UniProtKB/Swiss-Prot annotation:
The modification Cysteine persulfide is found at residue 405. Gene3D superfamilies: 1.20.1270.20, 3.40.50.2030. Belongs to the HCP family. Its main location: cytoplasm. HAMAP family: Hydroxylam_reduct. This is Hydroxylamine reductase. The gene is hcp. Catalyzes the reduction of hydroxylamine to form NH(3) and H(2)O.
Amino acid sequence: MFCVQCEQTIRTPAGNGCSYAQGMCGKTAETSDLQDLLIAALQGLSAWAVKAREYGIINHDVDNFAPRAFFSTLTNVNFDSPRIVGYAREAIALREALKAQCLSVDANAHCDNPMADLQLVSDDLGELQRQAAEFTPNKDKAAIGENILGLRLLCLYGLKGAAAYMEHAHVLGQYDNDIYAQYHKIMAWLGTWPADMNALLECAMEIGQMNFKVMSILDAGETTKYGHPTPTQVNVKATEGKCILISGHDLKDLYNLLEQTEGTGVNVYTHGEMLPAHGYPELRKFKHLVGNYGSGWQNQQVEFARFPGPIVMTSNCIIDPTVGSYDDRIWTRSIVGWPGVSHLEGDDFGPVIAQAQQMAGFPYSEIPHLITVGFGRQTLLGAADTLIDLVSREKLRHIFLVGGCDGARGERNYFTDFATSVPDDCLILTLACGKYRFNKLEFGDIEGLPRLVDAGQCNDAYSAIILAVTLAEKLGCGVNDLPLSLVLSWFEQKAIVILLTLLSLGVKNIVTGPTAPGFFTPDLLAILNEKFGLRSVTTVEEDMKQLLSA
């Protein structure tokens, strides 16, 4: 096992990465190794997808499957080894079908990629794990060095984050052939184990640029189906009655659940990154969507154990449900998996609803505590002139985007302390689950404009980018000249691709934490600092002083 993709990876003087029987996320060495094997199979599939496009062949089954299966290897998504192997087998079957399509056009069709003809050696998980050793990401570290390995992983993990957003967009009916062609090209190239530093740096920026387009179609999918988010108050306390909790990012799953629970007497609560759903008109119209429950994903083992109903996980993040003994009432959807828990294959939530009706639910309603979400792209753009006016009248000094992933590391208190230290004449724009560090606190307003503005899920960084570009255009300056600073927390691969997106767009002087990714070497950090001004957090006092004086 070698995995260094998330923030909580093991870090030692000898090197970084989880390489024992189990990773810090709870992933076993078996599952981790089989995920490496799956990625190799997906690289071979993408290699043939690139070749097929040369013949004008676009196989939508391949395009739909490839990013979804890659998503299953993201942190805290799928811990179920047999399902990972199932994805690998499906990848190979689709590859062979695509290869046959190419051969039907050109009998001499050939794909010159090391992964293009990969076959699984056995049905036995142990044998497959041994085969997977050929594809462990650091297998040639001694030959290529830490810097090249780090850049490879930056590209692989960044592309994995983009694949997750591609799947979210696909679920909502969004497809862009150019994006999929670019995805397959990059995925196939990474399967050649590239070792050119400049080419890898260029690839990282290409992934960021591609992801901006992915976030655009995802935004279009969400707003077309569910309307543009508008500011909405959400209760974060319990309401009497039977209940279901839904976590993750998939708004379509939430909509289906709300439709199927309507009139059943079962209330629905959002958790984690599902919180922004309350801002969408077509979702909040359901009166039994009663509130948001819990805090950051890392606290779920305590909070889920206390929730008096079933729980549905639609995407990341799931962690071991046996710890809180709620594994008999947690359900996984789509690419999510945990050994031994119930998995919903389709869109029928009937079994979950039936379980909710058999459980006690909340015995009484607590005194409401309301927070505000729903500052989507249209709302943010509608406030652009107000922001400019406040800046011109020196009522608004600075905007801080404080957001990103949450996690368990104690140093993440930095983001709470930073938010509460922001001066009263400054605004905090937030997104993703890092907001749970401070989103239940009171920040007041500036002439009626809330000082804490929740823009949505991690992918809604797109809205923040569009706002920044709009403000820069209106003020006749560059984005980097705005009174705007980005203070971002990271945990997994979606955060990595958001960072690459920002860097590829030329955004500079981003501050990140609580630690640097484990695959970043000192040399890579120095390169990113020199090119983009990217740096790690220090202390709240020093960072605040520097950002306000920039």
